[in-house]
Amino acid sequence: MVPAEYNSHHIIMKEYLIFLAQSHPAFRKAELESLADLHNIKADFSNHNEEHPFMIVQLENDEEAYQLIDRAILSKSIYELWGHGNTMEELHTDVKKKVDQLKERYIDSSFKFENLTFQGGKKSREQQVAIFDQFRYLEFTGKIKLKNPDQVYTILEQYSLGANLQPLDTPDHIWFGRQVNISARSRGAVEKYDIKKRPYFGTTSFDAELSLFTCNMGQVKKSDLIYDPFVGTGSFLVTAAEFGGITIGSDIDFLTLKGKGPKRRLKSNFDYYKKPLQFTDVLCMDFTNNAFRSNLKFGSILCDPPYGVREGVKVCGSNDPRKEGREKVVIDGQLAFLRRDYIPPKKAYSLDLLLDDLLHFASERLDVGSRLCFWMPVANDEDIPTMIPQHEDFELIYELVQDFHKWSRRLLVYLKRGDDYKGITLTSEDREGVNNFRDRYFHKFSKLSMADKKNSNSSSGSV
């Protein structure tokens, strides 16, 4: 373990303890890395363990610790670490080694103590006070304030569960630290953006927790223009506004954008959260044939492309070749597609082609260093590495898996690189795997879907 403080290039690093959430543990490290990169914080998270709720990191100062956790969704809080041990005796021994240099700045500050446990159940007030009294040797002279104190000192305990799934009598490990900051999660962000609390939501609305997490992975920043090309009911845009993003979206489905009345539409969600100025607009538009000016750039692109399960994958056009080339039809002296009552035809499209279009679009619309984040569904028995779309202008920096037994969805995070970077391009024609997720889904992920059986039968009948 790295010492509590060490001199590296004349910078003294300090130990901090992060209390992690137990939701989506496989995603926690990626979020912390993205937030550290967003704030230009150099930190090593290699000792992260998905099975443990605590992690020690080395940071320069409290400001870095505060920024790292402030908008985190999969972390709870961060503490300047004053000591730790397997028992209370070991903890106090460790704290006493460092206390003189650590407490000097806070000796006169108002304060309170708190006790947090992982899997340990809730202690009675008497039990907590007995633990707090053991730290009398700190000899703080400031006032005790239970509400809004200057400093909060926390004893954190990790317990294991016994055979009856009840916590054991003694903790496995104990930490003591000074609270630096609590996260957006601990301040209630996930509950605040709960889908059912919004005026307008639908069957395709994205989970609040993962929407907020996706915004962090996309490094949404204040005043950045954030775009969702499959906006639906606006889950990503609403949560992007929480982090200061200026939002714009589009969708090919006019009825979704129209909503269910003047008080139950996408804009109503921004009014509900008192962020109307961060909502630019939503456009009824096929993004593969978009109306944006050629030099318009976005800070991030975040989306959940239609899988074809609840909503089919469609773009403007016609599957009937007889109807192609009829764009110049004139009605009453006016081009048909310019009339207010014109409804553009739509045709079915494949998810693979849609993702190719998305990467190409993002390559033209994102500046170097910006991120494209989208969720891609796959059947778990597919050869997944061969199905991931690639573009020469992007580096795939994260592939995060949320498993649903027979299928999974993956958050793919791409970083736009500069001219000196030359990645590979894998379009739907180049990729070996075919993402026929919709067909597999409706046939309950059987080994041979109807389309596969049809191809198999036609092959066996040939000579």
Locations of the language-model features?
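Class I S-adenosyl-L-methionine-dependent methyltransferase catalytic core
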Residues: Y6-L68, F118-Q119, N148-D150, T154, ...
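Generic detection of long, well-ordered alpha-helical segments
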Residues: Q22-A26, G85-H92, G120-V129
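Charged/polar, solvent-exposed surface patches and flexible loops
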Residues: S34, T93, K97, A130-Y137, ...
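Conserved AdoMet
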Residues: E50-R105
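A short N-terminal interaction module
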Residues: D100-P167, I174
